[in-house]
């Protein structure tokens, strides 16, 4: 087995290979992330790891101009104004289906991504107790997370990709 010291250059190399592959495509679909909780939508700041992952996957994050590193509180209307026409919606809370997402707020069906099959959540590997493997294995394998995001936004670049963390909500 490899030590972490020996594995990091390999993982970094694969992440960079994937990110560089996306740079050759001119298409940068728009992306929004997260969902409201308790009436507040905490969007990922434009300098957050999520914003960077979306950019590395060839997406155009709708809040990329924000200078924050963490979550930024917004109301539904301000998010909808910027993200209502986004091509993809990632990580909409704990929902694993579009119907469960609508139970949270029926206005979600106004989002373009909702009506076009563009809602994906990182809930593919959640155990019976709610533990999500993206916060375990995914932190050690950012290249797997990036590959999932590329397969969502640019499926022709990774046509045989099998999702590790993300699933399309139906």
Where are these regions (language model features)?
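Soluble or luminal CAZymes and related metallo-dependent hydrolases
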Residues: 10, 71, 141, 145
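A hydrophobic alpha-helix/topogenic segment detector
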Residues: 3, 22, 133-135
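Short, small-residue-biased leader/transition segments that mark boundaries at the very start
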Residues: 1-8
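A structural signal for well-ordered alpha-helical segments within the folded catalytic domains
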Residues: 2, 48-51, 140-147
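Acidic/histidine-enriched alpha-helical segments
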Residues: 9-14, 31, 164-167
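Structured C-terminal subdomain patch of bacterial secreted/periplasmic proteins
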Residues: 91-170
